[in-house]
Design a protein with these regions (language model features):
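Short alpha-helical "packing" element that flanks the helix-turn-helix/winged-helix DNA-binding module
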Residues: 1-4
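Short acidic, hydrophobic short linear motifs in intrinsically disordered regions
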Residues: 7-21
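Short amphipathic alpha-helical interaction segments
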Residues: 22-37
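A short, conserved structural fragment
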Residues: 36-47
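Short, cationic-aromatic polyanion-contact patches
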Residues: 45-67, 110
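Helix-turn-helix/homeodomain-like alpha-helical modules used for DNA recognition
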Residues: 60-107
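Long, low-complexity, charge-rich intrinsically disordered regions
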Residues: 72, 89-92, 102-190
Length: 190
């Protein structure tokens, strides 16, 4: 499912997933329902995939252009930062900053990352309630042009709790959550 998002941009349909699900002797709808129950993805009111972390089926403030030219949407800032490592590709992330609506650019090239403006930060927050990550956390994990604008946003959203992290911390979080998600373990040699 994640590879399909990365290859095409849009969310896969149940029909797109049927062949892969059949290899495990299950129907795609059953697999998708199980994944949603464990919060690996989120469904809309019609049972369609609206998110398969880190990807969003709908436009968000976190656009990611992959080296292939495919544009995808991430659920949040940390998800966006994890996509290049997860896919092993260069990418350009262009989120719209809350508060200022300024564009921030985070460029992944050959294992190096550049942030513009250099003062940009990520604010990691969540609501003090339970539910799917898409509803509880994703709306608060944002890029900001500076610590000052992150503080302004935090004051405007007291229902979230969290902190500001710098480039290194934010990239490490994205890598930790998604970096090895699509790698497969090699069997031990005898």
């Amino acid at each position: 499912m994640l590879r399909r998002f990365a290859a095409t941009g849009p969310s896969p349909t149940l029909e797109d997933l049927e062949a892969a699900a059949a290899t495990s002797g299950r129907a795609a709808a059953e697999v998708v329902a199980d994944l949603a129950a464990y919060d690996f993805l989120a469904l809309d009111d019609h049972g369609r995939i609206r998110a398969a972390y880190p990807f969003s089926a709908l436009p968000t403030a976190h656009q990611v252009r992959l080296a292939s030219g495919i544009e995808v949407w991430a659920m949040c800032a940390i998800d966006a930062l994890g996509i290049p490592d997860m896919l092993g590709t260069d990418a350009v992330i262009t989120p719209a900053a809350p508060v200022t609506s300024d564009t921030i650019t985070v460029t992944f090239t050959g294992g190096h990352t550049t942030w513009q403006p250099p003062t940009a930060v990520v604010y990691i927050r969540q609501r003090s309630c339970t539910g799917p990550a898409a509803d509880v956390a994703c709306g608060a994990l944002n890029f900001f042009t500076s610590r000052r604008t992150a503080r302004i946003w935090a004051r405007q959203h007291p229902d979230y709790t969290g902190k500001t992290v710098d480039h290194t911390q934010a990239e490490a979080l994205g890598r930790a959550v998604f970096g090895s998600l699509l790698t497969t373990a090699k069997p031990a040699e005898e």
